[in-house]
Amino acid sequence: MRSSLRAWQRRCIDAALEHYSATPHFFCQATPGAGKTRMAAELALALLQQGKIDLVLCFAPSCQVVDGFRTTFSQVLGQRLDGLIGAVGDVCTYQGMEHRTEAFWKLFDEYRVFAVFDEIHHCAGHDPLLSNAWGQQILQRVQDQAAFTLALSGTPWRSDDRGIALARYSNPEGRLICDYRYGLREAVADEVCRSPRIVLLDNHKVKLTEELENDSSTQVFPSIATLLRGSPVSYEDLLCHDGLLNQLLGLGIEKLDEVRAIKPDAAGLVVATNIEHARQVALALAARGESYRVVTNRTPDAQQVINEFKSSDCRWIVAVGMISEGTDIPRLQVCCYLSRIRTELHYRQVLGRVLRRTGSTDNLAWLFVLAEPTLEEFSQRVADDLPEDLAILTQVQVPAMGLETPTDDMTAISQVEGLASKDSDRHAGTNVESALSLSCLEAPPIYQISFSQHYRQQLLVVC
Protein backbone atom coordinates (compact mmCIF):
# COMPACT_ATOMS: atom_id res chain seq x y z
CA MET A 1 0.00 0.00 0.00
CA ARG A 2 3.03 2.29 0.23
CA SER A 3 2.59 3.25 -3.40
CA SER A 4 -0.48 5.27 -2.37
CA LEU A 5 1.32 7.10 0.40
CA ARG A 6 2.15 10.77 0.20
CA ALA A 7 5.79 11.64 -0.30
CA TRP A 8 6.20 13.02 3.20
CA GLN A 9 4.70 9.86 4.70
CA ARG A 10 7.19 7.66 2.85
CA ARG A 11 10.09 9.86 3.91
CA CYS A 12 8.95 9.83 7.53
CA ILE A 13 8.54 6.03 7.59
CA ASP A 14 12.01 5.55 6.11
CA ALA A 15 13.48 7.98 8.66
CA ALA A 16 11.75 6.18 11.52
CA LEU A 17 12.91 2.73 10.44
CA GLU A 18 16.48 3.95 10.21
CA HIS A 19 16.14 5.77 13.54
CA TYR A 20 14.86 2.62 15.27
CA SER A 21 18.09 0.81 14.45
CA ALA A 22 19.78 2.99 17.07
CA THR A 23 17.09 4.22 19.46
CA PRO A 24 13.51 3.13 20.22
CA HIS A 25 11.80 6.53 20.45
CA PHE A 26 10.75 8.60 17.40
CA PHE A 27 9.05 12.01 17.55
CA CYS A 28 7.13 13.30 14.51
CA GLN A 29 5.66 16.77 14.18
CA ALA A 30 3.31 17.02 11.20
CA THR A 31 0.82 19.78 10.57
CA PRO A 32 -2.82 18.99 11.40
CA GLY A 33 -4.58 17.37 8.46
CA ALA A 34 -1.40 15.99 6.86
CA GLY A 35 -2.22 12.31 7.46
CA LYS A 36 -0.30 11.32 10.59
CA THR A 37 -2.59 8.39 11.39
CA ARG A 38 -2.10 6.75 8.00
CA MET A 39 1.65 7.22 8.25
CA ALA A 40 1.69 5.62 11.71
CA ALA A 41 -0.34 2.65 10.50
CA GLU A 42 1.99 2.06 7.55
CA LEU A 43 5.00 2.27 9.88
CA ALA A 44 3.38 -0.35 12.12
CA LEU A 45 2.84 -2.56 9.07
CA ALA A 46 6.50 -2.25 8.08
CA LEU A 47 7.66 -3.22 11.58
CA LEU A 48 5.31 -6.21 11.62
CA GLN A 49 6.47 -7.37 8.20
CA GLN A 50 10.11 -7.05 9.29
CA GLY A 51 9.36 -9.21 12.33
CA LYS A 52 10.44 -6.52 14.78
CA ILE A 53 7.20 -6.23 16.77
CA ASP A 54 4.40 -8.49 17.99
CA LEU A 55 1.69 -6.03 19.04
CA VAL A 56 0.56 -2.47 18.27
CA LEU A 57 -0.93 -0.40 21.10
CA CYS A 58 -2.17 3.11 20.34
CA PHE A 59 -3.18 5.93 22.68
CA ALA A 60 -5.16 9.05 21.76
CA PRO A 61 -6.78 12.02 23.52
CA SER A 62 -10.45 11.33 22.75
CA CYS A 63 -12.94 8.62 21.84
CA GLN A 64 -13.40 10.22 18.41
CA VAL A 65 -9.70 9.91 17.65
CA VAL A 66 -9.61 6.37 19.04
CA ASP A 67 -12.31 5.33 16.58
CA GLY A 68 -10.41 6.92 13.71
CA PHE A 69 -7.18 5.18 14.71
CA ARG A 70 -8.87 1.81 15.04
CA THR A 71 -10.44 2.12 11.59
CA THR A 72 -7.30 3.29 9.81
CA PHE A 73 -4.95 0.79 11.45
CA SER A 74 -7.33 -2.12 10.83
CA GLN A 75 -7.59 -1.21 7.15
CA VAL A 76 -3.82 -0.87 6.70
CA LEU A 77 -2.79 -3.87 8.80
CA GLY A 78 -5.60 -6.12 7.62
CA GLN A 79 -6.12 -7.17 11.23
CA ARG A 80 -8.34 -6.08 14.08
CA LEU A 81 -7.16 -3.55 16.63
CA ASP A 82 -9.90 -4.05 19.23
CA GLY A 83 -7.98 -5.76 22.03
CA LEU A 84 -9.90 -9.02 21.70
CA ILE A 85 -8.49 -12.50 21.13
CA GLY A 86 -6.80 -12.67 17.75
CA ALA A 87 -6.34 -8.91 17.43
CA VAL A 88 -2.96 -7.41 16.61
CA GLY A 89 -3.41 -4.74 19.26
CA ASP A 90 -5.70 -2.15 20.78
CA VAL A 91 -6.43 1.58 20.97
CA CYS A 92 -7.48 3.50 24.07
CA THR A 93 -7.71 7.06 25.33
CA TYR A 94 -5.11 8.64 27.57
CA GLN A 95 -7.71 8.82 30.29
CA GLY A 96 -8.32 5.10 29.87
CA MET A 97 -4.67 4.31 30.64
CA GLU A 98 -5.34 4.92 34.31
CA HIS A 99 -7.97 2.16 34.35
CA ARG A 100 -5.99 -0.53 32.56
CA THR A 101 -5.24 -3.65 34.58
CA GLU A 102 -1.82 -5.12 35.32
CA ALA A 103 -2.52 -7.76 32.67
CA PHE A 104 -2.53 -5.00 30.06
CA TRP A 105 0.77 -3.50 31.19
CA LYS A 106 2.40 -6.95 31.30
CA LEU A 107 2.02 -7.04 27.52
CA PHE A 108 4.97 -4.65 27.36
CA ASP A 109 7.10 -7.18 29.28
CA GLU A 110 5.96 -10.30 27.44
CA TYR A 111 5.75 -8.99 23.86
CA ARG A 112 7.57 -6.61 21.57
CA VAL A 113 5.13 -3.71 21.57
CA PHE A 114 5.00 -0.77 19.16
CA ALA A 115 3.36 2.06 21.13
CA VAL A 116 1.86 4.98 19.20
CA PHE A 117 0.86 8.21 20.95
CA ASP A 118 -1.32 10.68 19.07
CA GLU A 119 -1.23 14.35 20.08
CA ILE A 120 1.43 13.51 22.65
CA HIS A 121 1.49 17.11 23.91
CA HIS A 122 -1.41 16.16 26.19
CA CYS A 123 1.06 14.11 28.22
CA ALA A 124 3.43 16.16 30.37
CA GLY A 125 6.25 13.84 31.29
CA HIS A 126 9.70 15.17 30.49
CA ASP A 127 10.42 15.51 34.21
CA PRO A 128 8.86 12.96 36.61
CA LEU A 129 8.25 15.73 39.16
CA LEU A 130 6.34 17.87 36.65
CA SER A 131 4.44 15.19 34.77
CA ASN A 132 0.68 14.90 34.72
CA ALA A 133 -1.17 11.63 35.34
CA TRP A 134 -0.98 10.59 31.69
CA GLY A 135 2.68 11.47 31.38
CA GLN A 136 3.46 9.45 34.49
CA GLN A 137 1.86 6.38 32.95
CA ILE A 138 4.11 6.72 29.91
CA LEU A 139 7.23 7.29 32.01
CA GLN A 140 6.53 4.41 34.37
CA ARG A 141 4.82 1.86 32.13
CA VAL A 142 5.92 2.42 28.53
CA GLN A 143 9.08 4.43 28.00
CA ASP A 144 11.55 1.71 29.00
CA GLN A 145 9.33 -1.29 28.24
CA ALA A 146 8.10 -0.73 24.66
CA ALA A 147 10.14 -2.11 21.78
CA PHE A 148 9.50 1.12 19.84
CA THR A 149 7.45 4.26 20.39
CA LEU A 150 6.06 6.80 17.94
CA ALA A 151 5.03 10.18 19.34
CA LEU A 152 2.84 12.33 17.07
CA SER A 153 1.80 15.96 17.35
CA GLY A 154 0.74 18.78 15.09
CA THR A 155 1.28 21.33 17.86
CA PRO A 156 4.13 20.04 20.04
CA TRP A 157 3.96 22.39 22.98
CA ARG A 158 1.84 22.81 26.11
CA SER A 159 -0.02 25.83 27.41
CA ASP A 160 1.55 25.31 30.86
CA ASP A 161 5.10 25.25 29.40
CA ARG A 162 5.85 21.80 30.82
CA GLY A 163 7.87 19.29 28.84
CA ILE A 164 6.19 16.62 26.72
CA ALA A 165 6.48 12.91 27.42
CA LEU A 166 8.88 11.05 25.09
CA ALA A 167 10.20 14.38 23.75
CA ARG A 168 13.85 15.39 23.76
CA TYR A 169 15.05 18.93 24.39
CA SER A 170 18.41 20.48 23.60
CA ASN A 171 20.71 21.47 26.42
CA PRO A 172 21.01 24.19 27.62
CA GLU A 173 18.55 25.93 25.27
CA GLY A 174 15.67 23.59 26.06
CA ARG A 175 14.56 23.50 22.42
CA LEU A 176 12.32 20.66 21.26
CA ILE A 177 14.10 18.15 19.03
CA CYS A 178 11.88 16.58 16.36
CA ASP A 179 13.07 13.48 14.54
CA TYR A 180 10.86 14.39 11.58
CA ARG A 181 8.98 17.60 10.85
CA TYR A 182 6.42 18.32 8.14
CA GLY A 183 5.15 21.88 8.22
CA LEU A 184 2.09 23.65 6.91
CA ARG A 185 3.95 25.46 4.12
CA GLU A 186 5.27 22.14 2.83
CA ALA A 187 1.85 20.52 3.12
CA VAL A 188 0.20 23.32 1.13
CA ALA A 189 2.94 23.24 -1.51
CA ASP A 190 2.55 19.46 -1.80
CA GLU A 191 -1.24 19.87 -2.11
CA VAL A 192 -1.69 17.76 1.02
CA CYS A 193 -3.42 20.53 2.99
CA ARG A 194 -5.59 23.45 2.00
CA SER A 195 -4.13 26.91 2.11
CA PRO A 196 -5.70 28.74 5.07
CA ARG A 197 -7.47 32.07 4.64
CA ILE A 198 -8.17 33.78 7.95
CA VAL A 199 -10.71 36.62 8.04
CA LEU A 200 -10.55 38.92 11.07
CA LEU A 201 -13.82 40.77 11.72
CA ASP A 202 -13.60 44.26 13.22
CA ASN A 203 -15.79 47.35 13.59
CA HIS A 204 -14.63 50.95 13.37
CA LYS A 205 -17.39 52.47 15.51
CA VAL A 206 -18.23 50.60 18.69
CA LYS A 207 -20.40 52.48 21.18
CA LEU A 208 -20.28 51.68 24.88
CA THR A 209 -22.97 53.32 26.98
CA GLU A 210 -22.73 53.51 30.76
CA GLU A 211 -26.13 53.98 32.33
CA LEU A 212 -26.21 55.71 35.71
CA GLU A 213 -29.21 56.42 37.92
CA ASN A 214 -29.90 59.87 36.49
CA ASP A 215 -27.49 60.08 33.62
CA SER A 216 -25.63 58.10 30.99
CA SER A 217 -22.36 58.49 29.12
CA THR A 218 -21.18 57.05 25.82
CA GLN A 219 -17.72 56.18 24.56
CA VAL A 220 -16.87 55.34 20.97
CA PHE A 221 -14.05 52.94 20.16
CA PRO A 222 -12.43 52.60 16.71
CA SER A 223 -11.86 48.85 16.96
CA ILE A 224 -12.56 45.75 18.98
CA ALA A 225 -9.00 45.79 20.30
CA THR A 226 -9.33 49.31 21.73
CA LEU A 227 -12.71 48.40 23.21
CA LEU A 228 -11.22 45.44 25.04
CA ARG A 229 -8.24 47.45 26.26
CA GLY A 230 -10.15 50.53 27.38
CA SER A 231 -13.43 49.27 28.81
CA PRO A 232 -14.97 46.65 31.11
CA VAL A 233 -16.10 44.67 28.04
CA SER A 234 -14.56 41.20 27.84
CA TYR A 235 -13.96 38.96 24.85
CA GLU A 236 -16.58 36.57 26.24
CA ASP A 237 -19.13 39.40 26.24
CA LEU A 238 -18.53 39.96 22.53
CA LEU A 239 -19.01 36.30 21.69
CA CYS A 240 -22.59 36.47 23.00
CA HIS A 241 -23.49 39.74 21.27
CA ASP A 242 -26.28 39.00 18.79
CA GLY A 243 -25.22 41.60 16.24
CA LEU A 244 -21.57 40.55 16.19
CA LEU A 245 -22.49 36.86 16.22
CA ASN A 246 -24.84 37.26 13.27
CA GLN A 247 -22.28 39.27 11.32
CA LEU A 248 -19.59 36.61 11.72
CA LEU A 249 -21.97 33.77 10.94
CA GLY A 250 -23.20 35.69 7.90
CA LEU A 251 -19.66 35.83 6.52
CA GLY A 252 -19.26 32.12 7.11
CA ILE A 253 -22.58 31.31 5.42
CA GLU A 254 -21.73 33.44 2.41
CA LYS A 255 -18.35 31.74 2.04
CA LEU A 256 -19.87 28.28 2.45
CA ASP A 257 -22.29 29.09 -0.38
CA GLU A 258 -19.32 29.94 -2.61
CA VAL A 259 -17.44 26.79 -1.65
CA ARG A 260 -20.45 24.51 -2.15
CA ALA A 261 -20.92 25.87 -5.66
CA ILE A 262 -17.64 24.09 -6.43
CA LYS A 263 -17.74 21.30 -3.84
CA PRO A 264 -21.41 20.52 -3.08
CA ASP A 265 -20.79 18.47 0.06
CA ALA A 266 -18.61 21.10 1.78
CA ALA A 267 -19.60 21.97 5.34
CA GLY A 268 -18.92 24.51 8.05
CA LEU A 269 -17.89 24.26 11.70
CA VAL A 270 -18.84 26.70 14.45
CA VAL A 271 -16.80 26.33 17.64
CA ALA A 272 -18.97 27.70 20.44
CA THR A 273 -18.02 28.75 23.96
CA ASN A 274 -20.43 26.67 26.02
CA ILE A 275 -23.70 24.83 25.66
CA GLU A 276 -25.90 27.89 26.10
CA HIS A 277 -23.79 29.72 23.54
CA ALA A 278 -24.20 26.78 21.15
CA ARG A 279 -27.95 27.17 21.57
CA GLN A 280 -27.65 30.85 20.62
CA VAL A 281 -25.59 29.95 17.53
CA ALA A 282 -28.10 27.26 16.55
CA LEU A 283 -30.99 29.72 16.76
CA ALA A 284 -29.07 32.21 14.61
CA LEU A 285 -28.40 29.56 11.97
CA ALA A 286 -32.02 28.42 12.05
CA ALA A 287 -33.20 32.01 11.52
CA ARG A 288 -31.20 32.04 8.29
CA GLY A 289 -32.58 28.73 7.08
CA GLU A 290 -29.32 26.88 7.61
CA SER A 291 -29.28 23.14 8.32
CA TYR A 292 -27.13 22.23 11.30
CA ARG A 293 -26.23 19.71 13.95
CA VAL A 294 -25.22 20.49 17.52
CA VAL A 295 -22.72 18.31 19.36
CA THR A 296 -21.34 19.06 22.81
CA ASN A 297 -19.42 17.28 25.53
CA ARG A 298 -22.81 16.47 27.07
CA THR A 299 -24.52 15.19 23.92
CA PRO A 300 -25.69 11.57 24.19
CA ASP A 301 -24.19 9.44 21.41
CA ALA A 302 -22.01 12.36 20.34
CA GLN A 303 -19.79 10.17 18.19
CA GLN A 304 -22.82 8.88 16.30
CA VAL A 305 -23.91 12.46 15.63
CA ILE A 306 -20.44 13.27 14.28
CA ASN A 307 -20.33 10.13 12.14
CA GLU A 308 -23.75 10.88 10.64
CA PHE A 309 -22.68 14.44 9.89
CA LYS A 310 -19.56 13.22 8.06
CA SER A 311 -21.59 11.60 5.30
CA SER A 312 -24.67 13.84 5.33
CA ASP A 313 -25.54 16.95 3.33
CA CYS A 314 -26.03 19.03 6.48
CA ARG A 315 -24.32 22.41 6.11
CA TRP A 316 -23.13 23.20 9.65
CA ILE A 317 -22.03 21.48 12.82
CA VAL A 318 -21.96 23.53 16.04
CA ALA A 319 -19.53 22.09 18.57
CA VAL A 320 -18.53 22.58 22.18
CA GLY A 321 -15.49 20.65 23.37
CA MET A 322 -15.87 17.93 20.74
CA ILE A 323 -14.46 18.76 17.32
CA SER A 324 -10.95 20.03 17.79
CA GLU A 325 -7.81 17.98 17.40
CA GLY A 326 -7.80 14.68 15.63
CA THR A 327 -11.47 14.66 14.62
CA ASP A 328 -11.56 13.80 10.93
CA ILE A 329 -14.43 15.35 8.94
CA PRO A 330 -12.81 16.04 5.55
CA ARG A 331 -15.78 17.95 4.12
CA LEU A 332 -15.33 20.74 6.68
CA GLN A 333 -13.90 23.70 4.78
CA VAL A 334 -15.25 26.79 6.61
CA CYS A 335 -14.96 27.55 10.33
CA CYS A 336 -16.31 30.30 12.59
CA TYR A 337 -14.17 30.47 15.73
CA LEU A 338 -16.36 31.61 18.63
CA SER A 339 -14.63 29.78 21.45
CA ARG A 340 -13.61 31.57 24.63
CA ILE A 341 -10.38 29.55 24.63
CA ARG A 342 -7.49 31.73 23.50
CA THR A 343 -4.46 29.48 23.51
CA GLU A 344 -2.40 29.02 20.40
CA LEU A 345 -2.52 25.26 20.74
CA HIS A 346 -6.34 25.15 20.69
CA TYR A 347 -6.58 27.76 17.94
CA ARG A 348 -4.28 25.84 15.62
CA GLN A 349 -5.97 22.54 16.33
CA VAL A 350 -9.36 24.02 15.40
CA LEU A 351 -7.89 25.46 12.21
CA GLY A 352 -6.58 21.99 11.44
CA ARG A 353 -10.15 20.69 11.20
CA VAL A 354 -10.63 22.54 7.89
CA LEU A 355 -7.17 21.96 6.41
CA ARG A 356 -7.50 18.35 5.27
CA ARG A 357 -7.60 18.34 1.47
CA THR A 358 -9.69 15.77 -0.40
CA GLY A 359 -9.40 16.74 -4.07
CA SER A 360 -8.14 19.20 -6.65
CA THR A 361 -10.95 21.74 -6.20
CA ASP A 362 -10.84 22.26 -2.43
CA ASN A 363 -7.53 24.08 -2.18
CA LEU A 364 -8.63 26.80 0.28
CA ALA A 365 -9.77 26.66 3.92
CA TRP A 366 -11.59 29.56 5.57
CA LEU A 367 -11.52 30.63 9.22
CA PHE A 368 -13.59 33.57 10.48
CA VAL A 369 -12.66 35.09 13.82
CA LEU A 370 -13.10 38.32 15.78
CA ALA A 371 -10.20 40.77 15.62
CA GLU A 372 -9.22 40.17 19.24
CA PRO A 373 -5.52 41.00 19.73
CA THR A 374 -4.40 37.57 20.94
CA LEU A 375 -6.23 35.72 18.18
CA GLU A 376 -4.92 38.19 15.62
CA GLU A 377 -1.38 37.44 16.78
CA PHE A 378 -2.01 33.71 16.51
CA SER A 379 -3.41 34.21 13.02
CA GLN A 380 -0.40 36.19 11.86
CA ARG A 381 1.97 33.35 12.67
CA VAL A 382 -0.01 30.27 11.70
CA ALA A 383 2.59 29.50 9.03
CA ASP A 384 5.27 29.32 11.75
CA ASP A 385 5.05 25.61 12.55
CA LEU A 386 6.99 25.80 15.80
CA PRO A 387 6.74 29.36 17.19
CA GLU A 388 9.97 30.48 18.82
CA ASP A 389 8.40 31.36 22.16
CA LEU A 390 6.55 28.03 22.36
CA ALA A 391 9.40 25.78 21.24
CA ILE A 392 11.47 26.37 24.37
CA LEU A 393 11.11 24.27 27.51
CA THR A 394 11.16 26.46 30.61
CA GLN A 395 11.37 25.26 34.17
CA VAL A 396 8.03 25.64 35.94
CA GLN A 397 6.83 24.40 39.29
CA VAL A 398 3.24 23.24 39.10
CA PRO A 399 1.40 20.27 40.60
CA ALA A 400 0.61 17.24 38.46
CA MET A 401 -2.75 17.44 36.76
CA GLY A 402 -4.72 15.95 33.90
CA LEU A 403 -5.71 17.30 30.52
CA GLU A 404 -6.88 20.90 30.38
CA THR A 405 -10.39 20.26 29.10
CA PRO A 406 -13.04 22.98 29.02
CA THR A 407 -16.05 21.88 31.02
CA ASP A 408 -19.57 23.14 31.18
CA ASP A 409 -22.24 22.39 33.77
CA MET A 410 -25.22 23.50 31.74
CA THR A 411 -27.88 21.14 30.48
CA ALA A 412 -26.99 19.56 27.15
CA ILE A 413 -28.71 20.64 23.97
CA SER A 414 -30.68 17.95 22.21
CA GLN A 415 -28.95 16.74 19.06
CA VAL A 416 -31.25 18.13 16.45
CA GLU A 417 -30.90 19.27 12.89
CA GLY A 418 -32.03 22.78 12.12
CA LEU A 419 -35.63 22.74 10.96
CA ALA A 420 -35.86 26.27 9.62
CA SER A 421 -37.61 26.50 6.27
CA LYS A 422 -35.35 26.36 3.25
CA ASP A 423 -37.58 29.04 1.74
CA SER A 424 -36.57 31.59 4.37
CA ASP A 425 -33.91 34.16 3.59
CA ARG A 426 -30.59 32.74 4.75
CA HIS A 427 -28.91 36.06 4.12
CA ALA A 428 -31.22 38.34 6.10
CA GLY A 429 -29.55 41.44 7.49
CA THR A 430 -28.34 41.51 11.08
CA ASN A 431 -29.33 43.90 13.82
CA VAL A 432 -26.17 45.95 13.85
CA GLU A 433 -27.21 48.14 16.77
CA SER A 434 -28.32 45.42 19.20
CA ALA A 435 -27.30 45.97 22.80
CA LEU A 436 -25.56 43.67 25.24
CA SER A 437 -25.84 43.70 29.00
CA LEU A 438 -22.46 43.14 30.61
CA SER A 439 -24.09 42.15 33.87
CA CYS A 440 -26.17 39.15 32.90
CA LEU A 441 -27.32 38.38 36.44
CA GLU A 442 -28.26 41.90 37.44
CA ALA A 443 -31.02 44.27 36.36
CA PRO A 444 -31.04 46.87 35.08
CA PRO A 445 -27.80 46.62 33.04
CA ILE A 446 -25.01 49.08 33.75
CA TYR A 447 -23.30 48.93 30.37
CA GLN A 448 -24.62 48.49 26.86
CA ILE A 449 -22.61 47.99 23.69
CA SER A 450 -23.59 48.46 20.06
CA PHE A 451 -21.81 48.11 16.72
CA SER A 452 -22.22 50.32 13.70
CA GLN A 453 -23.05 48.86 10.31
CA HIS A 454 -19.50 49.57 9.18
CA TYR A 455 -17.68 46.30 9.76
CA ARG A 456 -14.14 45.73 8.56
CA GLN A 457 -12.66 42.48 7.30
CA GLN A 458 -8.94 41.77 7.22
CA LEU A 459 -7.97 38.79 5.07
CA LEU A 460 -4.77 36.98 5.99
CA VAL A 461 -3.29 34.76 3.29
CA VAL A 462 -1.12 32.58 5.47
CA CYS A 463 0.64 30.34 2.95
Question: PLM ranges: what are they?
Answer:
Residues 1-29:
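Conserved pre-motif I regulatory segment
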Residues 34-47, 52-74, 273-276:
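Conserved Walker A/P-loop ATP-binding site and its immediately adjacent core
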Residues 70-108:
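Inter-Walker segment of RecA-like/P-loop motor cores
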Residues 106-151, 155:
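SF2 helicase catalytic motif II
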Residues 161-262:
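Interdomain helical connector at the RecA1-RecA2 junction of SF1/SF2 helicase-like NTPases
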Residues 238-240, 244-247, 251, 255, ...:
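Long, largely alpha-helical accessory region at the distal end of helicase-like NTP-driven motors
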Residues 273-296:
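Conserved helicase motor "Helicase C" RecA-like lobe of SF1/SF2 P-loop NTPases
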Residues 291-395:
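Conserved RecA-like P-loop NTPase helicase motor core
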